[in-house]
Amino acid sequence: MVKHEFGIMKNNPKPSVGYDAYEPQKYNSISVDDDYIEQIVPRLNDVEFYWHSLDMPAKGLAYCGVTLIPPASIERMIEVIKPVDELSDLKQLLQKAFSENKWVIHYGL
């Protein structure tokens, strides 16, 4: 099965720095099956994220790339995934990041 990876960033991302390197272990990432991410992608298209760096603000997940999820967007993302029972681990990760005011990194396909 194809997976997406989500992890909590220990430090806030820095301007002009790219986060293209695939390093899920660095962020103690969890794996989420693409079948479940596919279900929520359309509902995230109005949520503000960053793709690959802080220099590229965008809406929606970088489905095949790297998404930087700011604390300000985490609550909305939790609302979107709440109805999908299979995303409970992701919901817990997002709640933890939100409570600690941390960024989340997403590695797409």
Question: Which role does the model predict for each range below?
Answer:
Residues 1-103, 107-109:
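Acidic (Asp/Glu-rich) sequence patches and key acidic residues
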